[in-house]
Amino acid sequence: MDDALAFYSETFERFELRSTNKPDPNGATFTADFAIYGHEFIGMNWPGGPAFNDSISLSLNVDGQEEVDRLWEAITARGKAGRCGWCVDEFGVSWQVSPIQMREHLENPDREKAEYANQALMKMSKIVIDELYA
């Protein structure tokens, strides 16, 4: 838990650690209440608890390629890359790193351009905005 909190505080510009519960002052954090980009989470250090899986992912809707690149590199450095903007961090948490500009391409009223963007997206790991243009 402590390593994850340190990683998230370094990675996400809008990370806020709100409270922690350390039953043993010299031990590991048992629970933590934190927010990432204003979304609240409670994490628990539960040895032997259920493992993370891809059925739940946290979506990061970011502005611009530079922010996509920064987050993608940080998350996948010790994690793993998936398809269509999905990746998993070193702690097993699944993320979707999506530029807000992607939606305008996928929802383009010109159906040919929208389909081009969709087909391009299906071939990507990290999303590259410029490659969504027809």
Task: State the predicted function of each range.
Residues 1-2, 11, 36-40, 51-52, ...:
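Vicinal oxygen chelate
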Residues 1-38:
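Core segments of cupin and vicinal oxygen chelate
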